[in-house]
């Protein structure tokens, strides 16, 4: 499985040096003619408008032009955020509403990211892999092709300490609902992690692990393959 692993130090440096942002959307009503909106993206007229910009700039706007603004509603999207969300239009994948994907995430063609899934900075999602509802893929985690990460599963992230080894889930792995894969673990190709398992050490290829902590309970057989079969039709983008 070939991947472009993101270096932890690169992420740390980017977070440390980035200008922290508090993005807002403001809906304002009043006598808006003569107000300087140059620091914002402004859509509206001289009576009503919508602003996209930074909280501090909006606070300064209120202080300067408060007598002209009759009312406003403010939506704060984040506070002192160090990294933006990803531009999901660049991915040839199915990404459902409510998924949260940070910048510097690689998502392969035909992948499926379901509602409520969270994918942190530097993670890699392989072609045809499904990240199910409310699953969490931590920073720098690497997931191969044609995997299924079950609802509520947690794939631990590793950004600090920067020397730590990220989680690697190889191709065609099925991780059951609410399972947890801890930092530094490699899950071998074609394996199955049972629902609710906590994986603390490497999993050999083509094995089934279960329990807390997870242990090998059997080798993959035809019955297991059928029960955990990946459905290609769910990855169809046409």
Curated annotation (Swiss-Prot):
GO terms for biological process: diaminopimelate biosynthetic process; lysine biosynthetic process via diaminopimelate. Its EC number is 2.3.1.89. InterPro entries: DapH, DapH_N, Hexapep, Hexapep_transf_CS, Trans_hexapeptide_repeat, Trimer_LpxA-like_sf. The keyword Acyltransferase applies. It is an enzyme of class 2 (transferase). It comes from the Bacteria. It catalyses: (S)-2,3,4,5-tetrahydrodipicolinate + acetyl-CoA + H2O = L-2-acetamido-6-oxoheptanedioate + CoA. Signal peptide: none annotated. The keyword Membrane does not apply. Belongs to the transferase hexapeptide repeat family. DapH subfamily. This is 2,3,4,5-tetrahydropyridine-2,6-dicarboxylate N-acetyltransferase. It comes from Thermotoga neapolitana (strain ATCC 49049 / DSM 4359 / NBRC 107923 / NS-E).
